[in-house]
């Protein structure tokens, strides 16, 4: 159900619940705007171990679930923003990112930040189109 402002709050148990006063995503008439995801396991709410590669994989899996719950998907992503704690992790993050976006890659910005929630090494948010074949 859409609010009077024309937006729909998106929430799924397949991705980590919000750790602050924000929504996992907001859906408008044609777009989905996700909150930043870090590499939290949604079942435990713990950060996955092993460095930036497994965290990036978990982040993108979380985003996939959020987008799918909004009648979208990774193939409809038009823009991502990647936040890295250390730009030295860029090649490892990038190799995992390429697995999730093998073709028709979205526009992307990548920035280094001083710190991320829960001590994460990577956070990603995105903007996506709705699936034109959705069933609303």
Which residue stretches match the model-derived regions?
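Short, polar/acidic, helix-capping and beta-turn segments at strand->helix junctions
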Residues: 2-136
């Amino acid at each position: 159900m859409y609010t009077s402002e024309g937006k729909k709050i998106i929430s799924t148990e397949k991705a980590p619940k919000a750790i602050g006063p924000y929504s996992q995503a907001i859906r408008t008439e044609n777009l989905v705007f996700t909150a930043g995801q870090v590499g939290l396991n949604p079942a435990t709410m713990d950060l996955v171990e092993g460095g930036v590669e497994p965290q990036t994989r978990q982040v993108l899996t979380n985003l996939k679930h959020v987008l799918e719950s909004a009648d979208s998907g990774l193939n409809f992503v038009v823009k991502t923003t990647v936040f890295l704690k250390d730009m030295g992790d860029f090649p490892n993050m990038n190799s995992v990112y390429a697995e999730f976006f093998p073709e028709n890659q979205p526009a992307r910005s990548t920035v280094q930040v001083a710190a991320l929630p829960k001590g994460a090494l990577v956070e990603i948010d995105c903007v996506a189109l709705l699936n034109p074949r959705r069933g609303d």
